[in-house]
Amino acid sequence: MDFEQLKQDVIAYSKTIGIDKIGFASASPFEELKQRLIQQQQLNYQSGFEEPDIEKRTNPQLLLSGAKSIIAIALAYPSKLKNAPLSKRGERRGIFCRASWGQDYHLVLRDRLQKLEAYLIEKLPDIEVKSMVDTGELSDRAVSERAGIGWSGKNCSIITPEFGSYVYLGEMITNVPFPPDQPIEDQCGSCTKCIDICPTGALIQGGQLDSKKCIAFLTQTKGFLPEEYRDKIGNRIYGCDTCQTVCPKNKGMDFHNHPEMEPDPELVKPLLTPLLTISNRDFKEKYGIMSGSWRGKKPLQRNAILALAHFKEASAIPDLIGVMKDDPRPVLRGTAAWALGKIGGDGVGEAIEKAMQREKDEEVLHEMNRGLELLAQKKE
C-alpha cells in the first residue's frame, strides 16, 4: 500500500467534510510531555479534570495496541460576535468564552472524526482506530504540535499560522503507518503579552499553566470561589479568553466556517439577573446545547452573582436578597450575601442580618459576616 498516497487522499477527503486543518504524527511515546506532566503533578498545577494516569496520557500504545500514527484535526471557530447586545445599567450581561459558542464542540469534532473513521475503514477494512476530543487520554496540544497543526504558545494553546489559536482539536490513533508531518517552529519569540495580562497569574514562563489559578477552570468549579479570585472573574460566566484576545497572532482572526459554531448573541452574552432563578428545564432547553453547560447551572449562577457584584448593580439587590434568603444551595446563598456586601445600599445590612438569624450553614454564615464587613468598610 502506498501510504503517502493514502495520506493525500485523507487530506483531500478531510476538506470535503469540514475539517480546516489536518496533520499526521508518529504514535511514539510523548517523553517530553511525560516529564512536564510529572513536574505539573509535583507542583500541584493540575485541575483534576485531566486523565490521572500519566502513562496513558503519554503512550498511545496503551490506548491502541499496534498504534503507528496519529491523525490530528483542527476546526476554526468564530472570535467575533455579530450584533452583540449591550450590557448597561439595569440590564447587565455576562459572557461565555468563545469555546462555548454554538453547539458543543465535542459533538462537532466527534462527527468529523466519525466520518474520517468511516472513510478509512472503507479504504482499509482491517484498520484499527481510536478517536478522542478534549476529554480523551492524550494531550490534544501535544499531538497537534507533533503533527504540525501549530506550535504550543505561551498561552498554553496551539497557535496555527492560518487561524491563530481559535481552533478546536481532536485526534485519531491508528495502526496505519502514515508518513508524519513536521512540527511548526515556535513563533512566540520574546512576546509575553499573555503572561503579563493573565488576571490571576496562572500562565508561567515556559508554557506552563497553574490550572487551579486559571479563570477558565475557576468558573467551572462548584464550590465557593476563593475571595482572592472573585473580583478577577469580572463578568465571565464560563471560561476566559484573555490570553487569546491579547495574542498578536490572533489579530484579525475570525472564522465562520461551520454553521454549528455560530453563536446566539443572547445565549453567549446573557442577561445576568434572569440566570439567578432559571429553572432546570429552562436551563437545559436554553443552554444545554453549549459546552459551557456541562457542569450544570450552579457554577454559572454563582458566576452571575459575582458578575453583578463586579458591576455593583443596584437593581439586582432584590433578586440577590431573594437568593440569599431562599435558594436551597449554600454556595449561592453565601455568594449572594458577599455580593450584597460589595454592592451596598439601603437596607442591605438589615437583610443580611435577618437572613443570618435562620441560616444554619457555617460557610454561608461566614459569607454573610464577610458581607457585613464589606458594608462596614464602605462607611469608613
From Swiss-Prot:
In terms of InterPro entries, this protein maps to: 4Fe4S_Fe-S-bd, 4Fe4S_Fe_S_CS, ARM-like, ARM-type_fold, PBS_lyase_HEAT, QueG, QueG_DUF1730
Q: Which GO terms describe its cellular component?
A: cytoplasm
Q: Which Pfam families match?
A: Fer4_16, HEAT_2, QueG_DUF1730
Location of this chain's protein in the cell: Cytoplasm
Catalytic activity field: epoxyqueuosine(34) in tRNA + AH2 = queuosine(34) in tRNA + A + H2O
Query: This protein's superkingdom?
Result: Bacteria
Predominant cellular place of this UniProt entry's protein: cytoplasm
Cofactor(s) for this protein?
Answer: cob(II)alamin; [4Fe-4S] cluster
User: According to its UniProt record, in which pathway does this protein act?
Assistant: tRNA modification; tRNA-queuosine biosynthesis
The EC number(s) this enzyme carries: 1.17.99.6
4Fe-4S ferredoxin-type domain residues = 179-208, 226-258
The free-text function statement in the UniProt record for this protein reads: Catalyzes the conversion of epoxyqueuosine (oQ) to queuosine (Q), which is a hypermodified base found in the wobble positions of tRNA(Asp), tRNA(Asn), tRNA(His) and tRNA(Tyr).
Q: This chain belongs to which protein, by name?
A: Epoxyqueuosine reductase
Query: What organism is this sequence from?
Result: Bacillus anthracis
Upper lineage: Bacteria, Bacillati, Bacillota, Bacilli, Bacillales
